Regions:
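C-terminal substrate-binding subdomain of Rossmann-fold SDR/epimerase-dehydratase oxidoreductases
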Residues: 20, 24, 41-190, 197-198
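Aromatic/hydrophobic pocket-lining residues that form π-stacking "cages" and hydrophobic walls in ligand
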Residues: 2, 37, 95
Length: 198
């Protein structure tokens, strides 16, 4: 519909295809894999995997997505642009990363794979790089670390403080909590430097 308005009426439009995005403020009950895994891991419940865990997905941190959208808004590109992270990971490996990050005792629970579940889901971001100069910059390990405190707080609202999980034991990866905050600040500053109108 938007493209029709652009072609017929000259309306200025921008089209973005958003692929798997994650970060703080995700709803625990939205059905997506990260909040589901986080909720289960922080509650020491079995991690639910559908199929054998070999299917791949890719995850783009919200800060990267926002930067891509802003660049598109200030560009002259009218064709659809894919925004996502092309780095694939198997669901099984992703579950293991979440368990390790949360210091959880959760085990993996396998369930039948839905018939319509895709084996691979990964964006082609060639156009985003060519016309916007955009590629995601936040490593998955860092993005998960920057999201952890939020999920701990949200799960705590449901069941109270998680007794087995002590803050001093939290494995936040190479960034650490202070590094996570600093990285987010640098991402925002970089976006402003690349486009002063942000």
């Amino acid at each position: 519909i938007m493209m029709a308005y652009h072609r017929e009426r000259g309306v200025e439009t921008r089209l973005v295809r958003i692929f798997n995005t994650y970060g703080p403020r995700m709803r625990l009950d939205d059905g997506r894999v990260l909040p589901t895994f986080m909720k289960q891991a922080l509650s020491d419940e079995p991690i639910s995997i559908f199929g054998d865990g070999s299917q791949t997905r890719s995850f783009c941190f919200v800060d990267d997505l926002v930067e891509g959208i802003v660049r598109l808004l200030y560009s002259d590109e009218v064709q659809p642009v894919n925004l996502g992270n092309p780095q694939e990971i198997t669901i099984g490996t992703f579950a293991e990363e979440v368990v390790a990050l949360t210091n959880s005792s959760s085990t993996i629970s396998y369930h039948p794979l839905p018939e319509d579940d895709p084996k691979v889901r990964c964006p082609d971001i060639t156009r985003a790089f060519e016309v916007l100069g955009w590629t995601p910059s936040v490593e998955r390990e860092d993005g998960l670390a920057m999201s952890l405190d939020y999920f701990i707080e949200e799960v705590g609202k449901l069941s109270g403080p998680r007794a087995p999980f002590r803050k001093s034991e939290r494995p936040l990866g190479r960034m650490g909590s202070r590094g996570a905050v600093q990285r987010r600040a640098k991402l925002r500053q970089r976006a402003r430097t690349k486009n002063p109108r942000i």
